[in-house]
């Protein structure tokens, strides 16, 4: 940046890890003046997150960085669970791509951070300041002032309309705000090791559920591999991270342990904690600053990216005067409960998969072996249907009698569609990065009054009509909108299936791809009226008199 004013910005993000950098990319896309303050002068090289799911990649698709990130990602990696005898008792390999991406993918955090930071160069209104530390803050009803120690050691004040704490599990900003991080710190520690040249042809994430020493082995990009070993209470956490100890731990799993190169090793403690508040005045917490999870279902970083996806458009809408400031509070009401649910699931999985008790491990093996003969239960596990999906009943949603289908407050699917010029595209690329209104086999503008159309246009919504594949009279004459909506074809019948399950041909889709409302031509007036509550008063009134 680019930004000429060093001391003033619309949004300040503290922390340039994957959550902070992802948020900065989205705010850059939305045209929001943004400053990112990062204490570390360089991207840190510790072993960190390696799992990224379909929801996260969908967010990066919106941000315009999914393709570049994918160059460093192994997609569609199965999860296999092995007992103490080395027998695989569960093979989790989801085959569905309902959101347009595979559910299980493996990456390395430091590579993703570099890509995300490099992508910020696209935006002259976004500034990344590394080697700078926030040492104090003050806020009032109008703005937040951060006291920042610059890379040169000098202090300066940074005024922002809003601040986001993406500064990790030890979050200094959360501490400054006095927000408790409630929950549990687990007594057991784990040594995490990244190696090269392991010579192991095991292209999966392996949970070695051996009660003698539970461990995880993860297939990483570019000939890397990660092991995570339980450290018992009587063991010294520094000694076990030494090269000779690491090789002794890995030796049972490789042919030539001397051949592998130990790249990095660190001992970690697992936490299951959630901040009591995600929003304090004009400051929001995201990622590890808001919640800490054990790694057993690979959702720690992904939960943080859900925070980012939920928060980015709300901040952008508020800053640009399209949404009222009260919408910020819905970030907490929508995200906190789901973040807690994911942590609870991770705790359950950890207790089931990594017991150190042999009788408990024996019982687990028998139960999971039996589950293979129950088709419904088997599919529930192998397709990862156990992962709780966010479902918003309050916040920026319009529920009520129209929600008989259960779609409102849930993420909409993302199939491929075909544009008027015959190009196959992912649905989100057609919807655009902001609000959209989909009409299934109807023009979404046809049932809007001039007043209602003016409101949605002022909000910035895009109108998209989806029709059945090959609905036109011939290849050269496809169905077109009479009102200027973009018209696309449902080439794989995925949207037809979705609308069969969720009645109502008109769907309001939020920028984070959650369904804000679903209705019909009669109900769209009520939905529009309800949505006016989310707009600034002057905008709602102006649209009402157009």
UniProtKB/Swiss-Prot annotation:
Keywords: Aromatic hydrocarbons catabolism, FAD, Flavoprotein, NAD, Oxidoreductase. Pathway: Aromatic compound metabolism; 3-phenylpropanoate degradation. Its EC number is 1.14.13.127. FAD binds at residues 10-39, 278-288. InterPro entries: 3-HPP/3HCI_hydroxylase, FAD-bd, FAD/NAD-bd_sf, PheA/TfdB_FAD_monoxygenase. One of its GO terms (biological process) is 3-phenylpropionate catabolic process. It catalyses: 3-(3-hydroxyphenyl)propanoate + NADH + O2 + H(+) = 3-(2,3-dihydroxyphenyl)propanoate + NAD(+) + H2O; (2E)-3-(3-hydroxyphenyl)prop-2-enoate + NADH + O2 + H(+) = (2E)-3-(2,3-dihydroxyphenyl)prop-2-enoate + NAD(+) + H2O. Its cofactor is FAD. Catalyzes the insertion of one atom of molecular oxygen into position 2 of the phenyl ring of 3-(3-hydroxyphenyl)propionate (3-HPP) and hydroxycinnamic acid (3HCI). PANTHER family: 3-(3-HYDROXY-PHENYL)PROPIONATE/3-HYDROXYCINNAMIC ACID HYDROXYLASE, FAD-BINDING MONOOXYGENASE. HAMAP family: MhpA. This is 3-(3-hydroxy-phenyl)propionate/3-hydroxycinnamic acid hydroxylase 2. It comes from Burkholderia vietnamiensis (strain G4 / LMG 22486). The gene is mhpA2.
